[in-house]
Amino acid sequence: MIIDTTEIETINSFSKLESLKEVYGIIWMLFPILTLVLGITIGVLVIVWLEREISAGIQQRIGPEYAGPLGILQALADGTKLLLKENLIPSTGDTRLFSIGPSIAVISIFLSYSVIPFGDHLVLADLSIGVFFWIAISSIAPVGLLMSGYGSNNKYSFLGGLRAAAQSISYEIPLALCVLSISLRVIRLSNSLSTVDIVEAQSKYGFWGWNLWRQPIGFIVFLISSLAECERLPFDLPEAEEELVAGYQTEYSGIKFGLFYIASYLNLLVSSLFVTVLYLGGWNLSIPYIFVPELFGINKRGKVFGTLIGIFITLAKTYLFLFIPIATRWTLPRLRMDQLLNLGWKFLLPISLGNLLLTTSSQLLSL
């Protein structure tokens, strides 16, 4: 049987095209993920620089100024130093738990960014249960901290891990109830818990349509609970230096210690982004009764300009809000453990339940 050479060449060209399609498909799938990871990394570096500059201003001292212009590269210098340090492992600890703990903490927080809309439908995964996906994923991070504390075989580390788990449980419930209070109205309008739908529900009435004005009590409870979830002062009991040396981080060094450092700022950034999405109107400019398309002529200039404006507005709101947790770290004293638990269970939980009851009643009366 004789096969024409042209037929063989045609078959080979088709096979090459199919393989190229598969390669381009993989690249097209990975490109948004890599872009998001790169953006998050740059965002964390900016937060570290902002915190150092703001803390220097509060304490009336000079902040970082030698590593790059205005000290902007100081975080990169610190990261390089941690990469070059020796990675020590306790000889009497559980090596597996000790090594897995930091990775669980970082990966769980990274997954939370997948449901955050940075612009009009500019979201990696627009899930119908987006906000509760974030709550479910964020509850995994304390498990990694507890594993790190237990695997270190150190009493200070173990106490720090236990404190992290207790603190997360205490403040996760009020935070979830505040999110549920916001979601009730969105469910009635669009039958969805998508973060995109939550932002669009706030865009109909401009500045006064923000959930900040509809849910002022929930906003305050959410703010306090998110600070506790981020383990920021005055809620940094799991790693209190005067009591526990460094808490669950005591036995860590090198890149694993750096992962905890990154995780704390990743958690701070994702909490501020969710405050922007849930309470501050997301990517909408929210000048009263003037929306972004009318103000900037986005419909005339194309979708790219509108997307860039949406990203800029979201990040501007986020970084303006970040001043609150950064300032509280350097101005408020640390709570005791009993005060922290009493605040969560005896005050924030009843207040969030009452807020949910009021929201439910108002929704039923408006039907």
Curated annotation (Swiss-Prot):
Signal sequence residues? none
GO annotation, biological process: photosynthesis, light reaction
Any S-S bridges, and between which cysteines?
none
Sorted alphabetically, which keywords does the UniProt record give?
A: Chloroplast, Membrane, NAD, NADP, Plastid, Plastoquinone, Quinone, Thylakoid, Translocase, Transmembrane, Transmembrane helix
Report the locations given in the UniProt record: Plastid, Chloroplast thylakoid membrane
Pfam families recorded for this chain?
NADHdh
* Principal location listed in the UniProt entry: plastid
Q: How does it sit in the membrane?
A: Multi-pass membrane protein
Which reactions are catalysed by this chain? a plastoquinone + NADH + (n+1) H(+)(in) = a plastoquinol + NAD(+) + n H(+)(out); a plastoquinone + NADPH + (n+1) H(+)(in) = a plastoquinol + NADP(+) + n H(+)(out)
- Is Plastid one of the keywords UniProt gives this record? yes
> What GO molecular-function term can you cite, just one?
oxidoreductase activity, acting on NAD(P)H, quinone or similar compound as acceptor
* Entry keyword annotation includes 4Fe-4S: no
The UniProt entry's coiled-coil ranges are none
| Catalytic activity, EC | 7.1.1.-
Briefly state the protein's biological role.
Answer: NDH shuttles electrons from NAD(P)H:plastoquinone, via FMN and iron-sulfur (Fe-S) centers, to quinones in the photosynthetic chain and possibly in a chloroplast respiratory chain. The immediate electron acceptor for the enzyme in this species is believed to be plastoquinone. Couples the redox reaction to proton translocation, and thus conserves the redox energy in a proton gradient.
Q: Which NCBIfam families match?
A: PRK06076.1-2 (NF004741)
Record protein name field: NAD(P)H-quinone oxidoreductase subunit 1, chloroplastic
Q: Which gene encodes it?
A: ndhA
